[in-house]
UniProtKB/Swiss-Prot annotation:
Catalysed reaction equations from the record: 5-dehydroepisterol + NADPH + O2 + H(+) = ergosta-5,7,22,24(28)-tetraen-3beta-ol + NADP(+) + 2 H2O
Gene3D superfamilies: Cytochrome P450
The protein's name in its UniProt record: C-22 sterol desaturase ERG5
GO CC entries: endoplasmic reticulum
Pathway in which this enzyme or protein is active: Steroid metabolism; ergosterol biosynthesis
EC number(s) from the headed UniProt entry: 1.14.19.41
The family this protein is said to belong to: Belongs to the cytochrome P450 family.
Keywords: Heme, Iron, Lipid biosynthesis, Lipid metabolism, Metal-binding, Oxidoreductase, Steroid biosynthesis, Steroid metabolism, Sterol biosynthesis, Sterol metabolism, Stress response
GO MF annotations in UniProt: C-22 sterol desaturase (NADPH) activity; heme binding; iron ion binding; monooxygenase activity; oxidoreductase activity
Known function: The third module or late pathway involves the ergosterol synthesis itself through consecutive reactions that mainly occur in the endoplasmic reticulum (ER) membrane. Firstly, the squalene synthase erg9 catalyzes the condensation of 2 farnesyl pyrophosphate moieties to form squalene, which is the precursor of all steroids.
Co-factor(s): heme
One GO term of the biological process aspect: ergosterol biosynthetic process
Length: 543
């Protein structure tokens, strides 16, 4: 009986082997299609399991998912996604993405370092380099950030103003020339002035004007590569590849500046830029530790030694953070003021009043503390048209973001900042440009949790005071030196996404010299009280 069973099974086995062998030999396409079907099924099942019950595409386009949408993002598509619910999702190639649109969920993500870490964008580590401090986490991030805090103290910010003002004076002349004959697009000139301001603030005059122009051109490629999700492999001559090459170019300039700055500080000279300020703090710490004498004056902060490469990578990240965001804000700011001449008039009156009619009074922090209405204008612009809409994070471990949904490990989770800044309960008529809402006792100043322009939590923007002061100083000085008109088009109010937001038509303006003597500043009244606004500003920025 057993023999008969064995004899029966052997031919059957041989038959199966023969059949499989035949298929493999003569029907390779069948095998390929079968494997493809298995991969598609796995990709789809994986997406459905990660998606759970939250809104998102019902089915994922095999393998690529929403890649085509990610290549050409629009504000309208983002906004439609936010409207689908507090949490929604998409999938692009290998990356599952969860988007949080509500304020409290966004704040929860930003304040959950044990679950998430910044990734900027999917290719961020490849472009900015994985050793960049912005990708540090936990204790390492805290220690590194401590070494940077001294660069943004009140004293340090004051020391940067002369270089910033010199850039404004230079580029205001270029603004006049750029639209001498007719209206011209100003998105690029605004990017140029911000790159120049950043380079002069960060590196002083260790970087030449020609080098600044070169850096601006290279940074355009870096920005272009910073799409939310890129093709997973870096192929030659793709956006990410060009972004990496541009990073290498910019790094060479910063490395050279760091070496020269270190040499200058070791010689005992006073710091005149952010890079020198940082190296000076290192030298002071080193001296204090080496002398180890009783009664020796202890530096305000003891920091470790940072290498030239660490310094350069840090300023690479600073330039990325400041250049795109402030370029966006400045473009919207000039456009909004041209569209609201009554607001521009109030800015001019304030600027001339605090300067007592002298437009050549140099910038100082004391002077800027008096620019209360100008500050309100800047804050309202940042609220209405926030440069950064969302901040991508990588999930380190399964993240129970709500009681009924857990974001899977290695997914990307994105807190949205826009919703909190357009909450009609806090900002009535949120689509209206109204600087008066920032009066010291107004609802806006009483709701600091909604002020999320610069993020929140342990990775909140380190240079937010610098960025706001830069915008206040620039627009304040421009208001009394320049006049400008805006040529509106059907796309003027459409938000284009290029890392940050810009007017779709790239902002058509025409500049001309302004005669400050035409402003009756002596009889003008203060919009807000200086003391009240200063106190409210501190509260809002520290929330």
């Amino acid at each position: 009986m057993e023999m008969n069973q064995t004899e029966t099974l052997i031919p059957a086995a041989r038959n199966v082997i023969r059949v499989l062998g035949y298929e493999i030999e003569y029907s390779k396409w069948t095998i390929c299609f079968a494997l493809l079907a298995v991969c598609i099924a796995y990709d789809q099942i994986s997406y459905q399991m990660q998606k759970g019950h939250i809104p998102g595409p019902r089915f994922k386009i095999p393998f690529m998912g929403s890649f085509l949408d990610s290549m050409k993002p629009t504000f309208e598509k983002y906004n439609a996604k936010w409207q689908t619910g507090p949490l929604s999702c998409v999938s692009v190639f290998h990356k599952f993405v969860v988007i949080a649109s509500e304020r409290d969920l966004a704040r929860k993500i930003l304040n959950s370092p044990s679950y998430v870490q910044p990734c900027v964008v999917d290719a961020g580590k490849k472009i900015l380099k994985h050793t960049n401090w912005v990708f540090l986490d936990g204790r390492d991030h805290i220690e590194y950030r401590k070494g940077l805090n001294g660069l943004f103290t009140t004293r340090a910010l004051a020391s940067y103003l002369p270089a910033q003002e010199a850039v404004y004076n230079k580029y205001f002349k270029e603004f006049l020339a750029h639209s001498k004959d007719d209206y011209a697009q100003y998105m690029i000139p605004f990017r140029d002035i911000n790159v120049a301001t950043s380079c002069r603030t960060f590196c002083g005059y260790y970087i030449s004007d020609d080098a600044i122009k070169h850096i601006a051109d290279e940074y355009w490629k870096i920005t272009a590569a910073m799409e939310l999700v890129n093709f997973p492999i870096v192929l030659p001559f793709t956006k990410v590849w060009y972004g990496i090459q541009s990073r290498k170019v910019v790094m060479r300039y910063f490395m050279k500046a760091a070496a020269e700055s270190r040499k200058n500080m070791e010689a005992g000279n006073a710091p005149a830029c952010m890079m020198e300020e940082w190296i000076h703090e290192m030298i002071e710490t080193r001296k204090y530790k080496s002398e180890n004498k009783e009664g020796a004056e202890k530096p305000s902060v003891l920091i470790r030694e940072f290498s030239d490469e660490e310094i350069s990578l840090t300023f690479l990240s600073f330039l990325f953070a400041s250049q795109d965001a402030t370029s966006s804000a400045m473009t919207w700011l000039f456009q909004l003021l041209a569209d609201h001449p009554d607001v521009l008039q109030k800015v001019r009156e304030e600027q001339l009043r605090i300067r007592k009619g002298d437009i050549d009074v140099p910038l100082s922090l004391d002077l800027m503390e008096k620019m209360t209405y100008t500050r309100a204008v800047v804050k309202e612009c940042l609220r209405l048209r926030p440069p950064v809409l969302m901040v991508p994070y990588r999930v380190k471990k399964a993240f129970p973001i709500t009681p009924d949904y857990t974001v899977p490990k290695d997914a990307m989770v994105i807190p949205t900042l826009y919703g909190a800044l357009h909450d009609s309960k806090v900002y009535p008529e949120p689509e209206t440009f109204n600087p008066d809402r920032w009066a010291p006792n107004g609802l806006a100043e009483q709701s600091p949790k909604n002020w999320m322009v610069f993020g929140n939590g342990p990775h909140v923007c380190l240079g937010q005071r610098y960025a706001v002061n830069h915008l206040i100083a620039c627009i304040g000085k421009a208001s009394i030196m320049l006049d400008w008109k805006h040529k509106r088009t059907p796309d003027s109010d459409t938000q284009m996404i290029f890392a940050t937001t810009f007017p779709q038509d790239m902002c058509y303006l025409k500049f001309s010299p302004f005669d400050a003597s035409t402003v009756d500043w002596k009889n003008s009244k203060e919009a807000f009280s200086n003391e009240a606004v200063s106190a409210a500003t501190v509260e809002t920025e520290s929330a």
